[in-house]
Each structure stands twice: as C-alpha cells, then as structure tokens.
Design a protein with these regions (language model features):
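C-terminal "capping" alpha-helix adjacent to the active site of nucleotide-linked donor transferases
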Residues: 108-133
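C-terminal alpha-helical cap of glycosyltransferases
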Residues: 128, 145-161
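A short, well-ordered alpha-helix in the C-terminal region of glycosyltransferases
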Residues: 134-146
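Short beta-strands and strand-loop turn motifs
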Residues: 1-2, 81-86, 110
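Short histidine/acidic/glycine/proline-rich micro-motifs that form metal-
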Residues: 5-7, 87-91, 142
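A donor-sugar binding/catalytic signature common to diverse glycosyltransferases
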Residues: 53-93
Length: 161
C-alpha cells in the first residue's frame, strides 16, 4: 500500500484504522516521510520510503496505490491486481481520476475514489480485489504491449487538447 513518494494522509489513516480487519493479509505499507505510526501487528510492515519500489511490487499479490501514470503502468507491467485511489480534483488536475477510470475500463484495476475512502470501504475494496485477482491478472495477460502503448498515446493526445 502506498500513496506516492510523500505518502497520503487519508490513505494512511484508513489503513491504520482497518489493520485489525485486514488480518488475513500481509501488508507492506509505505507511509511517506514522517508519517510513521507505531503499530505492531504480525501481518503489518511499515516503511517511510522505498528506494526500489519494484522490489516491493514484485513481492506483492495486490497493490493499493494512487493513480499516477508511471506507477500504474509499472504495476500493470508486473501484472499485479491493483486498487487505485486517485487524487481528487481538488488536489490535482484530475489526471489520476482519468488514469484510474481507464485502467478500470480495461479491466486492470478497481477504483476507490478518495471522497469515498473510509476504513470500511478500504477493507471491502481490498477484499473484493483479492477475490477477483485472477480475473485482473488474466485481463492484464491478455493485453499485449500494443494496447498499453495505445493507452499511453491516447493519454498524450487527450492531454494535448
């Protein structure tokens, strides 16, 4: 679970409050600099920053992330089912919402909008993603790099308008 290089307060708080419910998952939580909280659970590992995020992505069965283009394409390349929590329009240009919705349309990810993020919705979303992870993996395996390139090209064209 990570909210970008600086972390994400709302994601972190939802994770902290849902740790007990997420007991069936082993969680690596990248909280961002100065966002650590003392939580001692056998299934929970917390770090402030990951120098090589790919190592953590490779370890993961599922990824919970913001919806920045670089990150989600890296996660897709590794064929990891993902729950995307895009920055809202009040915090960004809205590009993360567009990215998340495109990945949802293509069957690569599920989406939980930040405005709907609570410990309960986070738990339900992670549980549903886990139940359906094979479907997401299969969909990512079906898609060659050509459609991914088309997604990137379409994004560039959309941004240039």
């Amino acid at each position: 679970i990570f909210g970008g290089s600086l972390g994400a307060k709302k994601i972190n708080e939802a994770v902290f409050k849902s740790i007990d419910k997420l007991k069936d998952f082993n969680i690596i939580h990248i909280v961002g600099k100065n966002n650590s909280k003392s939580i001692e659970k056998p299934n929970y590992f917390q770090i402030e920053f990951a120098k090589n995020i790919w190592d953590y992505f490779n370890l993961a069965d599922l990824v919970v992330s913001r919806a920045g283009a670089n990150s989600i394409f890296e996660i897709q390349a590794l064929k990891k089912p993902m729950l995307l929590i895009p920055l809202g329009k009040t915090q960004s240009r809205g590009d993360q919402i567009e990215n998340a919705e495109a990945f949802k349309r293509y069957g690569f990810a599920s989406v939980l909008y930040e405005e709907e993020l609570t410990p309960v919705t986070l738990f339900k979303s992670i549980t549903n993603l886990n139940k359906n992870k094979e479907r997401y993996i299969k969909r990512m395996e079906e898609v060659s790099s050509v459609p991914s390139n088309k997604l990137v090209l379409q994004k560039i064209l959309d941004l240039s308008k």
